[in-house]
Amino acid sequence: MKQYKLVNNVLGWLTFLVAAFVYCSTIEPTASFWDCPEFITTGYKLEVGHPPGAPFFMLTANLFSQFASDPTQVAKMVNTMSALLSATTILFLFWSITHLARKLILKDWSEMTMGKLIAIEASGLVGALIYTFSDTFWFSAVEGEVYAYSSAFTAIVFWLILKWEDHADEPHSDRWLVLIAYMTGLSIGVHLLNLLCIPAIVLVYCYRRYPHIELKGSLLALLASFVIVAGVLYGVVPGIITVAGWFELLFVNQLGCPFNTGEIVYIILLVAIVIWAIYESYTDRNFKRQNLSFVLSVGMLGVPFRGMGWGAAIVGIIILAAIYFGLNYRKKIDKQFVPVVSARFKNTALLCACLCL
C-alpha cells in the first residue's frame, strides 16, 4: 500500500510537470480577442466584470499580475496562472483515474502485484496525458479565462469525494464533505459550472453508504442532487440577498433607521442562528430545538425564498413548515422510533452551507 501511494504520488506530480511545461511553453504572450482581455484587465485593476462576475478569479489574477515587471507583462502572468491551474487539473485527473482503476482491478490491498500496479498507473498516465493534449482543454489552458480555473476546481472536488469514499467508515470522514462544500463555495466565485459536480458527488455518496442500492434509489439520489443544485443556484446565491433586502427595507423604510442597519442586523442574526443550529445538532440533546434551529437557519440563508413580495414570503414559509414536519418524522426500527434525518446529517449540512458561503 505504501509503495503504491509513493508511485502514485510521484507519477501524479510527473504528469503535473509535463502539463505545466507544455502549457507554460505555449501560453498566449498577450490578450486573446474575446473575453480574456476583460478578465485580465478586471483582475489587474480589480474592476467589475460581466455578470454574474468572477471575484475569486479576479483576486488570484491580481496576485499573479504583481509578478509582472511592467504592464505589458500582465496578460502573460495571468495566462501563466491559467496554465498552472490547468496542470493542477491534470494532476487531480490522474489521481482520480488511478483511484477508479484501482477499484476495478483490486478488491483488497493484498491482491496488489507489480502487474496490477503497472496497469493502474498506466491507466492514469494515458488518461491524464490524453486530456493534457486534447484540443479544447489545451486551448483554454493557455489564456486568461475562467474555464481553466473552473476545471481545476472540478477536478479537485471530484478527487475529494473519492478520498471521502476511501475514508467513509472513519469517525471524522465528514470533514471531506465539508471541504468539498468549501471548495464549491470558492468555485462559485470563479464560475457556476462547478455546481455540475454535485450529481456525481451525490451518486458516489449514495453508492458508498448504500452498496445494495437499486435503480429506484439511484434515480431518487439523482433527483435529490438536482434539488441541491437548484437550491444553491436559485436559493442560496440569490436568497441571501433577498432576505437581507427585506431586513434593510424594514429597518430603513419602516423603522427609520440609518442605511445598512437592516443588513447589519441580518448578518448578526444569521451568524447567531447558524451557530445555534450547529451547536444543537452537535450536542443532539433536544430533538425539537434541533429541528427548529435548523429550519430557522435554512430560512435565514434564503433557500426557500424565490422572488420578491408577499407571494415569495408565503411560499417560503410553507416550504419551511414542510421541512420542519419532515425533520420531525420518525420511523420504527427495532421497537424504537428513530429520526429519518440524523443529527449528524444536519450538522454536516449546516457546516457545508456555511463554508459554501
Predicted segments, located by residue:
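Membrane-interfacial entry segments at the cytosolic side of transmembrane helices
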Residues: 172, 211-223, 255-265, 283-295, ...
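Aromatic- and kink-enriched transmembrane "portal" helix at the membrane-lumen/periplasm boundary
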Residues: 24, 71-79, 104-120, 124-151, ...
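Short hydrophobic alpha-helices at membrane interfaces in multi-pass membrane enzymes
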Residues: 122-125, 167-185, 214-227, 289-297
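Start-transfer (signal-anchor) and selected internal transmembrane alpha helices
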Residues: 1-22, 88, 108-125, 324-357
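Transmembrane-helix motifs of polytopic, lipid-linked glycan transferases
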Residues: 13, 80-112, 156-160
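Short hydrophobic/aromatic helix or loop-helix immediately within or flanking a transmembrane segment
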Residues: 45, 50-76, 80-84, 91
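Transmembrane-embedded, aromatic-rich helix segments that form part
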Residues: 153, 193-205, 238-240, 312-319
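Membrane-interface transmembrane helices that cradle and orient dolichyl/undecaprenyl
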Residues: 114, 118, 157-176, 203-214, ...
